[in-house]
């Protein structure tokens, strides 16, 4: 989630309620680990942002509480779906695409064609050129793995990721 969004929400909430907000930006994995660590003595009031799967994990582990908002029926169907799937312990606030990004200048210098699809990344010419975040801490990187499993099937997805890693 963009820092600007968080700053605006924090300042607006403080202005409206008089309650001081201590906003901390962390990766999805860090927040989930923190909620697990705090389970016996919770310190976190609101978890805003992150990808859907960790929110569902937190809901299943009773790390979050249900909130039946009267605004839920006004949300997009996909956001309402996450609320239902989590027992109203999570609500989707944004939908972000997962895509490839590359530096055309670097590709031109190395005489590489731009990748056109995920499977292109496993080609030998891209060896050593691919970067990705750690899916243990990055919700987006984790979503990438889930996406590959959905696209290719589980075994083929992990074979693909091994090929990219080589």
State where each predicted segment sits.
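Short alpha-helix C-terminal cap/hinge motif
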Residues: 8-22
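Extracytoplasmic ligand-binding site segments that recognize negatively charged/polar headgroups
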Residues: 2-7, 26-30, 42-166
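Short, well-structured alpha-helical segments in soluble
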Residues: 33-40
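A short local structural element in Rossmann-fold oxidoreductases
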Residues: 10, 36, 59
């Amino acid at each position: 989630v963009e820092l600007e969004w968080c700053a605006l929400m924090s300042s607006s909430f403080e202005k409206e309620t008089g309650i001081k907000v201590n906003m901390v930006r962390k990766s999805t994995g860090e927040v989930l680990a923190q909620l697990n660590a705090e389970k016996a003595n919770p310190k976190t009031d609101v978890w805003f942002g992150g990808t859907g799967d960790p929110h569902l994990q937190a809901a299943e582990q009773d790390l979050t509480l249900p909130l039946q908002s009267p605004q839920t029926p006004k949300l997009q169907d996909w956001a309402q779906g996450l609320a239902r799937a989590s027992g109203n312990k999570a609500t989707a606030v944004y939908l972000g695409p997962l895509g490839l990004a590359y530096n055309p200048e670097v590709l031109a210098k190395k005489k590489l064609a731009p990748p056109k699809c995920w499977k292109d990344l496993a080609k030998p010419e891209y060896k050593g050129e691919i970067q990705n975040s750690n899916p243990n801490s990055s919700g987006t990187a984790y979503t990438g793995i889930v996406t590959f499993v959905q696209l290719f099937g589980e075994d083929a997805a992990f074979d693909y990721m091994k090929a990219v890693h080589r």
